[in-house]
């Protein structure tokens, strides 16, 4: 079997590449095509653990679900996790190989490209179709040399490209026409269709613009996709937090606040809280005060010591101290757990400069970062009401100390995780996705003060949203002009 590959590229970041790829994966799977997702290179702080014990971007895990297959490290062979303004942890085929500054990584790209092509070849041997997703824009002039994320990959595997742009941002015709104008002749030739995303209103009002675009570019517009209200899919990368924030909900609800430090990771952990009908969720940003809350969640971090210093500079440590003094609850996840201990040690400089620092000191434990990253999926039960829990661990920290004698989770394999404070105000765990299971989410909300929490089935909600995307594409995306680049469907 040798798969056909079709690639989704965007005229800008956040144009809708991930959503279009996800919907197309489900649409093809519905039609009996054995399909897999692929993203050559991803820069993301939201990641997922695969069945083969590696790490990929969160969007590729969701796209694998859309395909009805298990996520695999070959689906995102290069993952960059920013840990400073100029550097990232580099993950190749699911495994961290070290930290690199941007200039150093540029020289490493030929090696990364070999991994990209090897992963693609393995998937191509197993599937009928690969839906690949680009990163950012293919027309970034300063990134064209040695590109492995967009047209560099498309040229290497000789695949067609669909170019998508977001009309919600304005300037959609300039984005599409301008992107095509900046491509080389061979790159422009492999663009087989254009998509206008997130249009509100009557699409007939756009007809003159679409007609002009097709005449000007010589490319068919495959669809004008409507704005989907109440569509909830996990954000792909660190840019997800740059969207407008603030409180969600109100009235007689549990108040949950989450301080967002610069290197917050896996903030998809918050999604079930954002969507829960009985939760008023507030993402607290730089310069803002932590509002009155029943529960404060300290999320994961790609640089715990740096984010903890930043948290203190915001005065949030004092706000947390007051919150606990007046009976509030605090939940730490992964890096948040490490912050709650007495000491943090990074002797090898795995996340930043080598060194040690004081934690917040509310749990009697210390954490040392070690080169071997723990990547695993786990199932078990919370020590809160024996509620069933499931999720994944992604961390380099090894935590030790008396606080761990009161664990937060007991896993099915007999191991334990995390800590609960003796006064039961603090719950800390390495388990990402701890709110995803309905019973676990209910137990935590009850512990935080909500008397009768409703069950929110977040995995079922994700599945319904994938179907919602595919249903929309069935109605609004014309695949006929690109039929020859797709496998036969039933």
Swiss-Prot record:
GO terms for biological process: cobalamin biosynthetic process. The active site is at residues 334, 432. Transmembrane segments: none annotated. InterPro entries: Class_I_gatase-like (IPR029062), CobQ/CobB/MinD/ParA_Nub-bd_dom (IPR002586), CobQ_GATase1 (IPR033949), CobQ_N (IPR047045), CobQ_synth (IPR004459), GATase_3 (IPR011698), P-loop_NTPase (IPR027417). GO terms for molecular function: ABC-type vitamin B12 transporter activity; catalytic activity. Residues 253-440 form the GATase cobBQ-type domain. Pfam families: CbiA (PF01656), GATase_3 (PF07685). PANTHER family: COBYRIC ACID SYNTHASE, DETHIOBIOTIN SYNTHETASE. Catalyzes amidations at positions B, D, E, and G on adenosylcobyrinic A,C-diamide. NH(2) groups are provided by glutamine, and one molecule of ATP is hydrogenolyzed for each amidation. NCBIfam families: cobQ, PRK00784.1. This is Cobyric acid synthase. It comes from Chromobacterium violaceum (strain ATCC 12472 / DSM 30191 / JCM 1249 / CCUG 213 / NBRC 12614 / NCIMB 9131 / NCTC 9757 / MK). The gene is cobQ.
